[in-house]
């Protein structure tokens, strides 16, 4: 394919967007020698920076990420350009990992971008149903206050484009601000944090290498611990790491955003718990038995109690937390309610000696 100037390529795709499928644009971009531009000719700030040093080289933004699925279901780990991307994920839906039936929150039909559509009891959000001309976003129905909050987002479509992100934000985030701009919406300001499918973590307009890429079929877990003030991400139910600290006394909404045409994400788990002794015990049990399929197996507990713990705190008991440690806030910065678990016994002992 002959090389086009930046402006001519941009006009070509803008004028033909309504007539051509997304994969046709992907093929056109794949044949071009200038990578990193979306179909509108705007630069993809997520794909332009060097990737995490241990990861493969950056791929063109129009090519979906493959090989990162939670399961091995057909079609989750491969992408072809002979058919449209819409057709690629229109077949039999994968339900792997979708065991939960009760949800603490779903997507909010009243707080979303115009280029979104909800389905599956408002648990699945589809972005840019025909073609994309910017960035669409949505938030959950519940403001996350005190306690422990955990949710999982499953990528139910090919993952590609300038950005597809999972994260959190305050009520000050304008979800429709960039509906005509291709960008990484979550993390552009101090009111939000976003994990990009490219593996970059965004906050205050800055981005850092945080994880490997994720693609269709990937399950991204998010744990907001308002007791320690931490935000932790999981990929395919394995801990990636702590993304933010000192989040005590703040309230957030779960959020996602996408620039990709015909893309979609689904809430497959959303739960909350108070920071109770019951939670702390389950948390510690999981740390002591990180590789156990059933954390409570073999423990001398009544069957009824085991069932209650599984129902209320199953997400704690099932997570891979080999590297899941809540950081201790620096001295003088933590609030009284956010003291580390490790320092409290020492403080009580000192009081007894005095």
Curated annotation (Swiss-Prot):
Oligomer status and interactors: Substrate-recognition component of the ECS(SPSB3) complex, composed of SPSB3, CUL5, ELOB, ELOC and RNF7/RBX2. Interacts with MET.
Sequence ranges assigned to domain SOCS box in this UniProt record: 264-315
Keyword Nucleus: yes
Family statement: Belongs to the SPSB family.
Protein name per the record: SPRY domain-containing SOCS box protein 3
SMART domains documented for this protein: SPRY
Entry's Gene Ontology molecular function annotations: ubiquitin-like ligase-substrate adaptor activity
Species whose genome carries this gene: Mus musculus (Mouse)
Recorded domain comment: The SOCS box domain mediates the interaction with the Elongin BC complex, an adapter module in different E3 ubiquitin ligase complexes.
């Amino acid at each position: 394919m002959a090389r086009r100037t930046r402006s001519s390529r941009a006009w070509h795709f803008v004028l033909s967007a309504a007539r051509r499928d997304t994969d046709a644009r992907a093929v056109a971009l794949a044949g071009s020698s200038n990578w990193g531009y979306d179909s509108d000719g705007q630069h993809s700030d997520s794909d332009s920076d060097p990737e995490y040093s241990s990861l493969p080289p950056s791929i063109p933004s129009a090519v979906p990420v493959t090989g990162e699925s939670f399961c091995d279901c057909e079609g989750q780990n491969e992408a072809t350009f002979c058919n449209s991307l819409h057709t690629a994920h229109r077949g039999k839906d994968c339900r792997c990992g979708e065991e939960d039936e009760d949800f603490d929150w779903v997507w909010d039909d009243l707080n979303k971008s115009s280029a979104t559509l909800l389905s599956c009891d408002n648990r699945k959000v589809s972005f840019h149903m025909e073609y994309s001309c910017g960035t669409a976003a949505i938030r959950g129905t519940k403001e996350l206050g005190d306690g422990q909050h955990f949710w999982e987002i499953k990528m139910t479509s090919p993952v590609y484009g300038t950005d597809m992100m999972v994260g959190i934000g305050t009520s000050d985030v304008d979800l429709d601000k960039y509906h005509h701009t291709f960008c990484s919406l979550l993390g552009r300001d101090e009111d939000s944090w976003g994990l990009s499918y490219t593996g970059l973590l965004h906050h205050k307009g800055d981005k850092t290498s945080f994880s490997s890429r994720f693609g269709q079929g990937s399950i991204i877990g998010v744990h907001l611990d308002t007791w320690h003030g931490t935000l932790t991400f999981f990929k395919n139910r394995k801990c990636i790491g702590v993304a933010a600290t000192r989040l005590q006394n703040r309230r957030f909404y779960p959020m996602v955003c996408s620039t990709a045409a015909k893309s979609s994400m689904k809430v497959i788990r959303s739960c909350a718990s108070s920071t109770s002794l019951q939670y702390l015990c389950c948390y510690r049990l999981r740390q002591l038995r990180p590789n156990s399929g059933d954390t409570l197996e073999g423990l001398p507990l009544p069957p009824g109690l085991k069932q209650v713990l599984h129902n209320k705190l199953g997400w704690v008991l099932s997570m891979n937390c080999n590297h899941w440690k809540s950081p201790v806030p620096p001295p003088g910065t933590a609030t009284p309610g956010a003291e580390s678990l490790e320092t409290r016994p020492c403080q009580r002992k000192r009081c007894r000696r005095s």
